[in-house]
């Protein structure tokens, strides 16, 4: 790139998600039919391997009020700890019946959101470490310039969580708990509750990615 002085290049200005984020990214939720196959919160098929779970929660602002116009994406490994990507070169067989990625919007009335997925397996970390089962999550909403990245861990994986290099990189142990979803069983279904707090007391840990 001879002749280029990258110090002279200005950063492209960012914008918030705005009030029309659903029209662009989840048109069906805005009652606009565009796609034959709409994106949704279901990551599993009939033949998907692994334990079915539902991940659900709300997003709260600094005053403790639920946000009702947020959009959430998740991506995760399959039950064997393999991401459905050609870049994952662990040598393990990827589950062809698992999407590994989903997008949903919060309910306009209550702010609740949920995903139907499977509990992921542990994945390799740096320098031979192992990352505990987790789901990566990003939030888009009005008033947020850049999407907020966080992770969802599971409270019934305490031993694996204690060894996770990302959780251990968080200085205060009490802050790590903001990334741990609480398990319950409801009508025979395994549900993990994960509430996200944008600001204030018990603010969720977000990552600079």
Swiss-Prot record:
<protein>
    <recommendedName>
        <fullName>Protocatechuate 3,4-dioxygenase alpha chain</fullName>
        <ecNumber>1.13.11.3</ecNumber>
    </recommendedName>
</protein>
<comment type="subunit">
    <text>The enzyme is an oligomer of 12 copies of the alpha and beta chains.</text>
</comment>
<keyword id="KW-0058">Aromatic hydrocarbons catabolism</keyword>
<dbReference type="GO" id="GO:0008199">
    <property type="term" value="F:ferric iron binding"/>
</dbReference>
<comment type="pathway">
    <text>Aromatic compound metabolism; beta-ketoadipate pathway; 3-carboxy-cis,cis-muconate from 3,4-dihydroxybenzoate: step 1/1.</text>
</comment>
<comment type="similarity">
    <text>Belongs to the intradiol ring-cleavage dioxygenase family.</text>
</comment>
<keyword id="KW-0223">Dioxygenase</keyword>
<dbReference type="InterPro" id="IPR050770">
    <property type="entry name" value="Intradiol_RC_Dioxygenase"/>
</dbReference>
<dbReference type="InterPro" id="IPR000627">
    <property type="entry name" value="Intradiol_dOase_C"/>
</dbReference>
<feature type="binding site">
    <location>
        <position position="142"/>
    </location>
    <ligand>
        <name>3,4-dihydroxybenzoate</name>
    </ligand>
</feature>
<dbReference type="InterPro" id="IPR015889">
    <property type="entry name" value="Intradiol_dOase_core"/>
</dbReference>
<dbReference type="InterPro" id="IPR012786">
    <property type="entry name" value="Protocat_dOase_a"/>
</dbReference>
<dbReference type="GO" id="GO:0018578">
    <property type="term" value="F:protocatechuate 3,4-dioxygenase activity"/>
</dbReference>
<keyword id="KW-0560">Oxidoreductase</keyword>
<dbReference type="GO" id="GO:0042952">
    <property type="term" value="P:beta-ketoadipate pathway"/>
</dbReference>
<keyword id="KW-0408">Iron</keyword>
<comment type="function">
    <text>Plays an essential role in the utilization of numerous aromatic and hydroaromatic compounds via the beta-ketoadipate pathway.</text>
</comment>
<dbReference type="Pfam" id="PF00775">
    <property type="entry name" value="Dioxygenase_C"/>
</dbReference>
